[in-house]
Each structure stands twice: as structure tokens, then as C-alpha cells.
Amino acid sequence: MYAVFGLTRSEVTPHEAAAARYKHRGVIDRRGAAMTSRRAPDGGLNLDDFMRRQRGRHLDLPYPRGYTLFVCDVEETILTPRDVEYWKLLVVTQGQLRVIGTIGLANLFSWDRSVAGVAADGSVLCYEISRENFVVRAADSLPQLLERGLLHSYFEDVERAAQGRLRHGNRSGLRRDADGQVIRESACYVSRALLRHRVTPGKQEITDAMFEAGNVPSALLP
């Protein structure tokens, strides 16, 4: 089971208060609120339970106004499975990533919304498709995202990306402190990333299977 967060059942946390608020807003039912009781070391939602109960729903985010998290699997996003495998190679994910849906204004099409995933440390990352693709830290945890919305730094990082001021997320682009420890970046470019939309050259549709087989480039390979 993939669990990213944990406190004891008897503890009352802000996350459980947030779950109660979502229940009253019709987002989750009484059984859904119980998912905050099964926890792993960091305190928060059980990701498997969350995905099972919320899949296919738009969850309103407190900030910014009008933004939602649409809970879905990678198959309902613009990314291919191969794209996600290369996303996992970025240092910021620590080698582990679970796609949880898309984030953006509720009236946007799926391919115009950022793809959201949970990394090994529990943080929520957004994959942004642009002229040069990049990944941004959207929240320190999934419970924080649901309770407070996107980090204010998220929009600052998106602006930095537009200005060409991010570093690349591969190991050669890492910064280290005086002790040699990696300085974690809140946003980074995806090395050699290219914009990919599903297209039909001639009469042949480019499929996920073709990307996985390596016959044509994915969003993360030239």
C-alpha cells in the first residue's frame, strides 16, 4: 500500500478538521473522513484511500479562488506513463511519485491544467507544460493542499520559469551547501523536455504504447 503520511487515531489534527469541513461541503462522506485516521509517519491522508474515494471529483482549493484538484490517475492527464517514469528521475521526487490528478481553474480542459503528483517526502509537485517544461512544489503535503491551497511561492516559481531563471532538475544541475548536502529547489526545469500533445500525423495516431516502446519521443525526451 502506498501511504505517505501518520499520527495516532486519538489525536485531533487540523487535517481531520479540514476533512470534516469537506464532508459538510459534500466533497466526502462520513466514511471518507475516516481516511485521516489511518496514518503513516508524517501525519496526514492515506493516499490509497484518498484516491479510491475521491477519484473523478473536483475538490475546491482554498487558494487561489476558483482552483480545484481534479482527482484522477495518470491515464486522464496529458502525460504518458513513460513521462511519469522520467519525472521520477528528478532529484526533487527522491525516486518516487504518485500522480493524484490535475490542478487549475475548474473550467479549463484537462490538458490545460497542471499535473499533480505526491513525491517520496509527501510534498505535492506540479508538472507544468510550457516552452520548457518544469516542475514546481505546490504544497508541503496533500493535507496542506486541501486545507490551505497552493503555496504562494508556487506562482513566484511559475514566473521565474517564464523568465528562464530555474535550474535543471538533473544531478549535474544541483547546488550544494558547504557540507556537500543538496540544496532543495522549489522548482526546476525538466531536462531536455519538449511539449507533447496527442497528434495524428497523416492517418497514424501517436499512442502511449509507441512512446513506451521508444519509437517516438515522449514529453521528456527529444
UniProtKB/Swiss-Prot annotation:
It is found in: Virion tegument; Host nucleus. Pfam families: US22. ISGylated; ISGylation regulates UL26 stability and inhibits its activities to suppress NF-kappa-B signaling. It comes from the Viruses. Keywords: Activator, Host nucleus, Host-virus interaction, Ubl conjugation, Virion, Virion tegument. GO terms for cellular component: host cell nucleus; viral tegument. InterPro entries: US22-like. Its main location: virion. Interacts with UL25. Interacts with ISGylation machinery components ISG15, UBA7 and HERC5; these interactions inhibit global protein ISGylation. Plays a role in the inhibition of host NF-kappa-B. This inhibition affects both the canonical and the non-canonical pathways. Blocks the induction of host IKK phosphorylation. May also influence the normal phosphorylation state of several tegument proteins including pp28 in virions. Also suppresses virus-induced ISGylation independent of its own ISGylation. Belongs to the herpesviridae US22 family. This is Tegument protein UL26. It comes from Human cytomegalovirus (strain Merlin).
